[in-house]
Amino acid sequence: MARDATKLEATVAKLKKHWAESAPRDMRAAFSADPGRFGRYSLCLDDLLFDWSKCRVNDETMALLKELAVAADVEGRRAAMFAGEHINNTEDRAVLHVALRDTSSKEVLVDGHNVLPDVKHVLDRMAAFADGIRSGALKGATGRKITDIVNIGIGGSDLGPVMATLALAPYHDEPRAHFVSNIDGAHIADTLSPLDPASTLIIVASKTFTTIETMTNAQTARKWVADTLGEAAVGAHFAAVSTALDKVAAFGIPEDRVFGFWDWVGGRYSVWSAIGLPVMIAVGPDNFRKFLAGAHAMDVHFRDAPLEKNLPVMLGLIGYWHRAICGYGSRAIIPYDQRLSRLPAYLQQLDMESNGKSVTLDGKPVSGPTGPVVWGEPGTNGQHAFFQLLHQGTDTIPLEFIVAAKGHEPTLDHQHEMLMANCLAQSEALMKGRTLDEARAQLQAKNLPASQVERIAPHRVFSGNRPSLTLIHDMLDPYTLGRLIALYEHRVFVEAQIFGINAFDQWGVELGKELATELLPVVSGKEGASGRDASTQGLVAHLHARRKA
């Protein structure tokens, strides 16, 4: 069926009415009255548990949300994506990051062409190159083994590889991985300063080989290599992830060190492609294939499972409920796993660049809120930074906890138990809160004077009723990481379909880039600032004055 705008609008209205009527409901009372609540509002896929029972929903909520998914034709749009249809309508492109991890023998067609053999060819080339670097068969220009790789990219060419490489640290042997993204010269200077060009491989990740930040840093790195080892050494110390073979050749990188990908792969969905080359070199081709396999398992589940048993669909529906119906403007991603410390930033781009839109697929203004602000930090660090606001602030911010049942350090299992206890405690505290009477009783138990009890008790009240969901997996390994990332990718897709927006373009990044190009000669003093707004003129004048001071 096609998207039913009339039914969609009616269901949204029913959801808003339902929220207004059920909002005062106390979550502690809901759990006390319903021992089966956890069982009804949780799902498992193998070892992965998704629990949303601490969100402010009931059976009517879930029935209406499923009705919403049907009206939005989530299943039809999902089928269109997997079939290679051009669902990215503003750029007239297919959206097939799922093909990058498809290990089946089925055809995946884009405009009549089966792309799976192309995907396999690039993956095999990546594996051969990674094995060569890791084994020392592919050496630097002076004959030394490569001990360090530096990935130069930005956005999707950086956030995914950084996140995955850090997350899979227990699977590293060598070489060491480093990442440069910012145009700020301090980033590349600090990265290169402790390294030796003779044992360093630099990967330049830019599809067009024109991305200003990436190419500026790449030229700096090229000069670093050439000044030390000579111009002829450049080819042995660089590789590229790009489709612009002419530009790559002009830079000095041999074609056999160039790895391409396709326009049906968006940047924020590209870690599965050649963009993941630094990850593959760091953890090895076998582990990278396990990473792909985990994502593919989630793809199959998302494609085949019924709506009410489908983890990405349920996660997306809860996300929509929080954003569009409850009116919560942000969501906090809190992985209780230090190695997932870059996951919030990765999901920030995935979600906000995808669903930060204000027009519908047909170019009309949206009728309600779209994607939330996404942010977060790993636990327990966040508890000592911003959890105060989450517990007692005036804004309700849903939390998404992620934790593993087991860690990689068996001799430190007691610390992992403390980590898990903190994660579950925060989830429980947000839901239960603490009443004024409970705060008084706690203070009275300390034999404090009555006046002090009355003075302090209001400050120790927690409203509770603050929603959170929890994802638990066995252990963070390549398969688990791939499955987790694919879960969030498909969650974003589901929310976008209900919002009625295109999750696969990013025109919002263009205007600032255009103006930066115009302003560069102004900032450098080659052109004047006349014709620009008074604020920009004043800022330019101040910068010029301070640079001369």
Swiss-Prot record:
Annotated catalysed reactions: alpha-D-glucose 6-phosphate = beta-D-fructose 6-phosphate
Gene name per UniProt: pgi
Entry function: Catalyzes the reversible isomerization of glucose-6-phosphate to fructose-6-phosphate.
Protein family per UniProt: Belongs to the GPI family.
CDD domains: SIS_PGI_1, SIS_PGI_2
Entry annotation: catalytic residues: E353 (proton donor), H384, K513
Source species, domain of life: Bacteria
Alphabetized SUPFAM superfamilies for the sequence: SIS domain
Location(s), subcellular: Cytoplasm
Pathway per the UniProt entry: Carbohydrate biosynthesis; gluconeogenesis; Carbohydrate degradation; glycolysis; D-glyceraldehyde 3-phosphate and glycerone phosphate from D-glucose: step 2/4
Keyword Transmembrane part of the UniProt annotation: no
Entry-linked InterPro entries: G6P_Isomerase (IPR001672), G6P_Isomerase_C (IPR023096), Phosphoglucose_isomerase_CS (IPR018189), SIS_dom_sf (IPR046348), SIS_PGI_1 (IPR035476), SIS_PGI_2 (IPR035482)
Organism: Brucella melitensis biotype 1 (strain ATCC 23456 / CCUG 17765 / NCTC 10094 / 16M)
EC number: 5.3.1.9
UniProt keyword Cytoplasm present: yes
Alphabetically ordered keywords of this record: Cytoplasm, Gluconeogenesis, Glycolysis, Isomerase
Name listed for the protein in its UniProt record: Glucose-6-phosphate isomerase
